[in-house]
Amino acid sequence: MLSIVGIFAILMTAPRFANTLSPVPAFAVNVIAILLLMILGCHNVIMYNHSTFVLGYLLLLGYDVTGASYIKRVEGLAAGMILCMIIFYKNQKNRPYRRTFFDLFREFDLHSARGRWYLKLTLIVSSAMLFMNLLGLPRAMWAGIACMSVCLPFTNDCVARSGSRWQFNIVGCAIFIVLYLVLPESMYPYIGMIGGIGVGYSAGYPWQTAFNTFGALSIACLLYTSPSPRD
């Protein structure tokens, strides 16, 4: 239960705080927040919980809100936290536990494969966003998400996924260009949605990567107001 509270507390506060800082202090906040998320939620590495918790953090970081919208975001996260706690208690209340909350921190060891993976993912994701911010490029979270998706607990898996990622990024770009040329301009805003549907129906990572490029390229077109290739 304490781990759930800790995870949601980080999601409520750290992304908003990091967005108020310059790139280097924000990097420090991201390192601390992501490492804590890994320790609290990713002890069982084969569950790939980082793809939920760290991804959630990066999305909250990238889509920043303030004022009344931030209050509503916190309220929504609080409701989600309570719901998760209720479900967790209902399903796990009779299960014996041999570890306490503080054992999660005691077992953090850089000599273990799990501990090294925690630190590796944390530094790679945070550094990618730092470089994007220092270069003044928008949407730094996308660099973090891309790095997170290939930084897996097992090295062999990282190599295989990295190879398929760049190949299917090219495939996704090619399909996007075809859609951009074929569809009427009024349909351009929906290309990202088409990609989202494609991701949902893709069972494997390669095609998920291909369809994910639709959203990224759609945002790029809006950011840089690229003229239509027909012009």
Task: Give the predicted meaning of each segment.
Residues 16-29, 138-142, 185-187:
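Structural signature of hydrophobic alpha-helical transmembrane segments
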Residues 3, 7-11, 29, 33, ...:
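Alpha-helical transmembrane segments in multi-pass membrane proteins
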Residues 20-92, 102-106:
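Membrane-interface helix-loop-helix junctions at boundaries between adjacent transmembrane segments
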Residues 106-126:
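Membrane-water interface at loop-to-transmembrane-helix junctions
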Residues 1, 39-50, 157-164, 200-209:
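Membrane-helix interface "capping/anchor" motifs
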Residues 126-179:
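Transmembrane helical segments that form the transport core of multi-pass membrane transport proteins
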Residues 51-59, 147, 191-196, 212-217:
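Central hydrophobic cores of alpha-helical transmembrane segments
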Residues 224-231:
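Conserved small/polar residues in nucleotide/adenosyl-binding loops
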